[in-house]
Amino acid sequence: MDHYRSVLDRLPEAFTTVWISDHLQFGDRPVREGWTLLTYLAGAFPRFRYGHLVLAQSYRNPALLAKMAATLQHLSEGRFILGLGAGWHEEEYRSYGYPYPSGGTRVAQLAEAIELIRAMWTDSPASYRGVHYQIESAYCEPRPDPPIPILVGTNGPKALAVTARLADQWNWDGPWEVYRAPYERLRAECDAIGRPFEEITLTAGLTISMPNDVTAFEPTYEHSFYPGQVFQVLGPSPDDVIREIDRLVDVGVQHFQVYCEDLQTLDRFIEQVAPSVGGVRSPPPRIKEKHRDG
């Protein structure tokens, strides 16, 4: 756990949250189970709030997940954010024996999971009958206090419609040129159902590289866990990063999840970027994997 400590111990007070991915395997590479890891970190580093980017709704029965989240909310004294997505990584579904239905079905399951979880947190007892998930006279005591915000991480049209209807927060990756299309789709989905867009807290994940030698900067990045998927990288200078963050702040993004390629970049971000965006809470880097979802 030295890696986590070396990252989290160096963060100033402006960094307020820690985010963990939720995967079971990528071939034979080492992957820690996300709920267990997050629970450990929440106990070991109690000054942060914690969430997942994002939990695959398929991997845990939603009624049990509601109970797990409520328990963690009490143990952490209100420091948990429930990040959910439809699930996408077929390899781990197949390897671990989970059914892998169509994308549309997984998004429908996501919507039902959120509805069921909210029922568990607010009704006592709770009953819910959906196409995919059902409960009958289920108790979730003690219920979470304070209420747990639900974040949905997605750029898919169907899942954005679910986000507009049911989520408290939304996450997708920056920079603005990547973020813009799902942002505009989410705004349109909110308009269509009459929900004020401003009710949803907007968050953005940023991949950042600020090498001392600017000629070493690569504007795109392919994570070893996501072959074939290319991420846009912010950099190479602090001014470049600040400019992109400001563009996202201008459209209402309130919270950032930062993925730094190395500790040198993290230190430069802390010293040269974070003070210039002090009006926005800038969370710590996502540790290890990035998320990608419905």
For the regions a protein language model found, what residue spans apply to each?
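Acidic (Asp/Glu)-rich catalytic clusters
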Residues: L8-E13, L38-R47, A69, Q73-R79, ...
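Active-site pocket-lining/capping segments in soluble small-molecule metabolic enzymes
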Residues: T203-P238
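Hydrophobic faces of well-ordered beta-strands that scaffold small-molecule active sites
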Residues: V18-I20, R49-L53, F80-L84, I150-G153, ...
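Short, acidic/polar
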Residues: M1-L11, L65-M68, V152-R165, E218-T220, ...
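Active-site-adjacent beta->alpha loops and helix N-cap segments on the catalytic face
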Residues: P30-L37, P175-C190, L263-R268
